[in-house]
């Protein structure tokens, strides 16, 4: 199956523009698109081959030798960002230790170390490359933190890229969204990357009497944070992709892929020591201390034996919404706290889907992919002067996904009689940054 990608937007553009003659855009664009598709295909093929050579579950992940823990050197420009899993991969040398990685490296690493399915790994990695990195580089990549200082060309800028790649720190409403487990909302603090220790401690204290956390604990925490954000963030936005899928997947990923799956174990049970290690928290007596960027894979830690892929995310989101229906409500606050308003899915889809039908089969993924397909063309025009390559990645991925998932035909998506993008941004103040999926 040819998974190439997903996603939406970054509208804020830096002053510096890399211009290119308009009459050459078509030829260059199609050549770049073809080359980039080949890079993605090679990444998937390589990851599959390495996966066959790796006997998951029979040995702990190596954290010695070339994979020993080395914390980041921020003074030298090392990058760390909002994703604990990627930060840990960099600290152990599974991706480049400076935190500026590429497509092939990242797909292979998150599959090998964490057991993320290659389909899901490809989608998320390509998302990072297209929307916060540089897909037009000869070596397409992205920063897991912010734009590397002192080396604006570290990602190999070519023609067609507007401004500088911003890294995952600049991915609000694209990859990173409001109401996360351990990160504050961007509009509230101005920093959605650094862990908020009070939020970590609140979750840490939810451990069972045995000091563990299961799926139900993470699901309850997702519900709690949703309501906390309504009460504290006047610009809270909970979109179909960044809210229902990505935001909630952040809770599941910690449970499903960061838990220690000791030899022979198929349970996704997180313990406090593992949680502290992956979230860069050290314990001395009863005191917990956060060391930014020090996320670490524990010694004698085993990856899951069965990969966690796109369909697993779908099932987990459906399970979550079934238990806490408010987490299936697309919408946001209206500029004031406690002013949350939802958008009727039936209205968006022209009556094809409602919340009940959305939770049947693969309809949730189908709907979200349709949102991405609808929003992407205008979104990408704010990022690239040559839109063909990144847009082709998205349309290829969505076309493949929609066919594989046997998706229903959906009419043009609208909000309040306008296009989805315009309608959602007009209705919710928090949706105005980037293109907001």
UniProtKB/Swiss-Prot annotation:
Keywords: Heme, Iron, Metal-binding, Oxidoreductase, Peroxidase, Signal. It comes from the Eukaryota. Its cofactor is heme b. It is an enzyme of class 1 (oxidoreductase). InterPro entries: Chloroperoxidase, Chloroperoxidase-like_sf. GO terms for molecular function: metal ion binding; peroxidase activity. Binds 1 heme b (iron(II)-protoporphyrin IX) group. Residues 1-19 form the signal peptide. Pathway: Secondary metabolite biosynthesis. Heme binds at residue 83. Its EC number is 1.11.-.-. Aromatic peroxidase; part of the fragmented gene cluster that mediates the biosynthesis of fusarochromene, a tryptophan-derived metabolite closely related to a group of mycotoxins including fusarochromanone. The role of fscJ within the pathway has not been identified yet. The first step of the pathway is the epimerization of L-tryptophan to D-tryptophan in the presence of the NRPS-like tryptophan epimerase fscC. D-tryptophan is subsequently hydroxylated by the tryptophan 6-hydroxylase fscE to yield 6-hydroxytryptophan. Belongs to the chloroperoxidase family. This is Aromatic peroxidase fscJ.
